Structure formats: C-alpha cells, structure tokens
C-alpha cells in the first residue's frame, strides 16, 4: 500500500506478520519485550500475541509467538531502517531482491537477543521474522522504493 505525504510517496505495508520461536529455556515475557522493542511506540497498544505450543526436532517443547500489525498509523519501514546499523542496511540493500517474493511480501529477520536489548540487527539464526505485505504495488516499484529508503 502506498500513500502520499505531502508530495512525498509514503511506502507502507498493509499488513505485518511477526513471528518468533521461543525455546523452553527462554522467558516468554522477554521474547514479547524483544518484539515490542522493534515496533514503533504508536503501534504497541494494538498488539495482541498468540502463543502456540509446538515440538522441536528432538521432541523438546517450543513456542511460536505471533502478532500482526494492521492499519499502521506511522511509517514502520522508516522506523525499522533508521534503527538498523549502517552495515545491516547495506547488507539488506545488497540482498534486497532475495527478500521480496512475487506477491510483494518483504521478509526481514531480526536478531531476537539484540532486540531484547533495544537494538535492531539483521540475523538469520533464531530470529524475529517479519513478513510485510504490500498491496497494489508492482514488485519492481517496491524494490525501487525500498532501495531509496535504505540509501538514506
């Protein structure tokens, strides 16, 4: 979804799905705090978490913690990209094509431990997973707009 803010094109996902796996040894409250730390203040009040109990590869108990952000009031992408360190922004910029599917979903994985500490970092292992859905936008336009935002 895109909007205009004055003369500026505002790129905003129509939906953001956040999911993270919690292990039996982890504190669920801390995992929720990590998720809250990557969300703009104005979106936190609307978050509702679902927790699903699952079984890991070795029979160990794990939890899938999920939340969905809809009707975003602010610019989540701007918030996210400003929080990323320069080296992570560059890495994401260089790999952007691999993070966007043909349905204009933009996927990002963030470091769960860093998020708990109030930092935003890209990380593939044991991450907080974000799936940002964009409607009524061509993939090529989405890539171009994300590139522009990441270069700021």
List where the protein language model places each region.
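Glycine-rich, aromatic-bearing surface loops/beta-hairpins
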Residues: 106-152
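Short amphipathic alpha-helices in soluble, non-transmembrane regions
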Residues: 31-34, 78-85, 146-147
